[in-house]
């Protein structure tokens, strides 16, 4: 039996072909075990820091429309400002009309008639057919080439599932899950008919890494991950690219974090990373149609997934401890505030 490792300067002196094959096999497994993490490290670094994403014009030329849910604050607002700067007309959907009007006025003041803006105020928690019918009428005849599924809701504070208020639980499911499905089902048929389009759904580490005391929110984001990946496979043959965008903390009203850091970007930093890495997996190595585009989030996602496992006991315990601590601090603050009144 030929020694297949001789070209690499490794010679196995064994008359028995079985022994030679076994030793060769063990050596190859050892080499592969060493090479796999090295290759994975190179891939994640290239994806996060070197390789560009797909151009937005791949999915629709400037002058077509982008529909953004949860558009009046935080990440959604930043998507609106960024896409307007790139030449896309906007359909802004959120709960509060006054905030939508203010954002629309800011964009119109900056870009004038070059960027058209339409708004729709609706409360996704109510799941009203009339609201979705209004959305359908609003987008009728428009070339909506980009959909940003951004609207979302978390718990007011970390809470055990058995103590979660029924209304909070229902609102999370309606906003995070049902609203995303219904909006996407309204918008994507037009993309399919035009054979191009982009759907970005904002997910969360809570959907990848089980998060005790945010169980309903964590489950809703896990649902979005599975749904988005399945939808992406369905729509890919029709020229529509669907990507689930993973993130850790961002300075938004939902996170209640105001100060940025290496691990916590502001909305502009996060949106810039997202739009510059479309089609790149970032830290979500090996997860189809998914990206963790912000550099520190990507490195964190990759490290935890590769070396600990998304659903490992260690990750779940650490998550539980962190959110138990957040809950204690939130309850103490509520007590102090109550005494002041």
Swiss-Prot record:
GO terms for biological process: fatty acid elongation. It comes from the Eukaryota. GO terms for molecular function: ketoreductase activity; very-long-chain 3-oxoacyl-CoA reductase activity. The keyword Metal-binding does not apply. NADP(+) binds at residues 67, 123, 131, 150, 217, 221, 250, 252. The active site is at 217 (proton donor), 221 (lowers pka of active site tyr). Pathway: Lipid metabolism; fatty acid biosynthesis. Its EC number is 1.1.1.330. GO terms for cellular component: endoplasmic reticulum membrane. Gene3D superfamilies: NAD(P)-binding Rossmann-like Domain. It is a single-pass membrane protein. CDD domains: 17beta-HSD1_like_SDR_c (cd05356). The chain crosses the membrane at residues 22-42. Keywords: Endoplasmic reticulum, Fatty acid biosynthesis, Fatty acid metabolism, Lipid biosynthesis, Lipid metabolism, Membrane, NADP, Oxidoreductase, Transmembrane, Transmembrane helix. It is found in: Endoplasmic reticulum membrane. It catalyses: a very-long-chain (3R)-3-hydroxyacyl-CoA + NADP(+) = a very-long-chain 3-oxoacyl-CoA + NADPH + H(+). The keyword Transmembrane helix applies. Its main location: endoplasmic reticulum. InterPro entries: 3_ketoreductase_fungal, NAD(P)-bd_dom_sf, Sc_DH/Rdtase_CS, SDR_fam. It holds the Pfam family adh_short. Component of the microsomal membrane bound fatty acid elongation system, which produces the 26-carbon very long-chain fatty acids (VLCFA) from palmitate. Catalyzes the reduction of the 3-ketoacyl-CoA intermediate that is formed in each cycle of fatty acid elongation. VLCFAs serve as precursors for ceramide and sphingolipids. Belongs to the short-chain dehydrogenases/reductases (SDR) family. HAMAP family: 3_ketoreductase. This is Very-long-chain 3-oxoacyl-CoA reductase. It comes from Pyrenophora tritici-repentis (strain Pt-1C-BFP). The lineage of its organism: Eukaryota, Fungi, Dikarya, Ascomycota, Pezizomycotina.
């Amino acid at each position: 039996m030929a020694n297949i490792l001789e070209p690499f300067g490794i010679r196995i002196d064994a008359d028995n072909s079985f022994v030679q094959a076994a030793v060769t096999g063990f050596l190859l497994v050892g080499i592969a075990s060493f090479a796999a993490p090295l290759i994975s490290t190179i891939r994640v670094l290239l994806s996060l820091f070197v390789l560009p994403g797909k151009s937005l014009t791949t999915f629709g030329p400037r002058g077509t429309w982008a529909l953004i849910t949860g558009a009046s604050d935080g990440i959604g607002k930043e998507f609106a400002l960024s896409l307007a700067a790139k030449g896309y007309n906007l359909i802004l959907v959120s709960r509060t009309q006054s905030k939508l009007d203010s954002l629309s006025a800011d964009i119109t003041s900056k870009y004038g008639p070059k960027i058209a803006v339409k708004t729709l105020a609706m409360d996704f928690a109510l799941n009203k057919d009339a609201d979705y019918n209004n959305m359908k009428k609003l987008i009728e005849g428009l070339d909506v080439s980009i959909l940003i599924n951004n609207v979302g809701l978390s718990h007011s504070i970390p809470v055990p599932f058995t103590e979660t208020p029924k209304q909070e639980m229902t609102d999370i499911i309606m906003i995070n899950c049902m609203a995303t499905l219904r909006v996407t089902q309204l918008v994507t048929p037009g993309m399919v008919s035009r054979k191009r389009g982009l759907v970005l759904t904002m997910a969360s580490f809570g959907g990848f890494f089980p998060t005790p005391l945010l169980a309903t929110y964590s489950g809703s984001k896990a649902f979005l991950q599975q749904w988005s990946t399945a939808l992406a496979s369905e729509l890919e043959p029709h020229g529509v690219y669907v990507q689930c965008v993973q993130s850790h903390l961002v300075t938004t009203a939902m996170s209640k974090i105001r100060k940025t850091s290496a691990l916590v970007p502001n909305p502009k930093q996060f949106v810039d990373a997202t739009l510059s890495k479309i089609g790149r997996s970032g830290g979500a190595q090996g997860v189809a149609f998914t990206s963790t585009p912000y550099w520190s989030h990507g490195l964190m996602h990759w490290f935890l997934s590769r070396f600990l496992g998304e659903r490992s006991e260690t990750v779940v315990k650490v998550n539980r401890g962190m959110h138990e601590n957040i809950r204690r601090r939130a309850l103490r603050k509520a007590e102090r505030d109550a005494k002041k009144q």
